[in-house]
Amino acid sequence: AGGDTAVRQSHHQSPADRCRADVAACMSTVDSLEQELGELERATEKAAAGGVAASMGATCPKDTTFLHLGDRLEKALISLDEVDTAGEDELRALRKGAVRRIQALIERGDAARARAEAAR
C-alpha cells in the first residue's frame, strides 16, 4: 500500500518538483559512488606507496573494479539525460551541475585507474 501512495503522490507533483526529486535521487546514488571511488583511490595510493603498506598486503584495486564504477557513473549520467527540466533555467542549471560532478568523478576514476595500473 505504501508504494501506491508514492505513485499517487508522484502524479500530484509539479514537473519542477518531479525534476528536483529525480536529480536528488540521482545525486544520492552519485554520493555513494563518490565514496566508493575515494576508497579505491586510497587503496591505490597505499599500494603505490609500496614499503610497509605493500608488505602488509595492500593491493591495488583490480581494473574491473574501476570499470564497474565507471559504468555505474555512466548510467547515472544517462538517468540525468532523461530528467525533464520543463524548460526552466533553474532546473537546467541543477541538472547541469549534477552532470559536471559526474564527469569530474569519471575523470578522477580514470586517473586512479591509470595510477593503479602503473603500481601493479
Feature roles, as predicted:
Residues 1-2, 6, 68:
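Short amphipathic, charge-patterned alpha-helical segments
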Residues 13-120:
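Eukaryotic low-complexity, intrinsically disordered regulatory regions enriched for acidic, serine-
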